[in-house]
Amino acid sequence: FLGIVAVLIIIFLIWQFTTTLVVIFALASIFYTLTSLYKLVAGYSALEHRYLIDTSPEALDLMDERTLPMYTILVPLFREAAVIPYLVQGINSLDYPKTKLDVRLLCEEEDDETYQAIIDQDLPPHFNPIIVPASDPQTKPKACNYGLQGAKGEYVVIYDAEDRPDPAQLKKAVLMFDNVDESIVCIQAKLNFFNQQTNFLTRWFSIEYSMLFDLVLPGLDARKDPIPLGGTSNHIKLKELVEVGAWDPYNVTEDADLGVRLHQAGYRTTMMN
């Protein structure tokens, strides 16, 4: 279909260049205006959205750690040797029983430097370095799918190598899963930059992330619309993740794609405050 559209555009550009450009820009402007209006509606919905689950430190202190489920953490890695010490430190700082963690560091077969950096860390038993065999496509979603083999957790979360997750994030997710409707099988944590004050670029990125994760996505949550997941800190029930086919290894926006497919399967995603 897209090929046919491209051919038609080329034909019309040759035939009526100026008119075709005007039509293309007009259609693009209409599309941009409609998406902007939709974001405004979602943002307005977010202002009235209330998080019904109490995930305050006081509520987390009441949780019985003996009843906490196993949690699988997937960390896809490629040429990340420099940040491995910080990654291990960040995961070790998670306030969750280490005996109930299944941490899977997914390293591409060709990436000897990152794998050696992992080995040099003298990792505790709950860390499991996994070499992802070289094959096409060499993508993050393919690595995550490979890492699901033999996963021990009831829940799965993805972290990127540079992430610094809230130490209480896993407990918050478990508390929410225990108290929300069973149709909710995915929880997306809010994301932002930890170095937002470094320069203008990081400030701009931080503003964009704040708009998405503090307004647009909570608004979609309030409206029960599909939520395009962020690429990290999304917590998913393993059973339902496998049921919908996990991640599409050929999709470069595998996170957003998974959020839509979960919705199509009749499941819901909610936001973690």
Give the ranges of each region predicted by the language model.
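N-terminal membrane-anchoring/stem segments of glycan-assembly enzymes
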Residues: 1-65
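N-terminal signal-anchor transmembrane helix
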Residues: 37-73, 78-100
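Cell-envelope/extracellular polymer assembly enzymes that use nucleotide-activated donors
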Residues: 69-72, 102, 242, 257
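Acidic donor-binding segment of Leloir-type glycosyltransferases
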Residues: 92-136, 178
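Long helical/loop segments within the catalytic core of UDP-sugar-dependent glycosyltransferases
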Residues: 120-154, 167-252, 263
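Short acidic donor-binding/metal-coordinating loop in glycosyltransferase active sites
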Residues: 161-163, 254
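Catalytic donor-sugar/metal-binding loop of nucleotide-sugar-dependent glycosyltransferases
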Residues: 250, 259-273
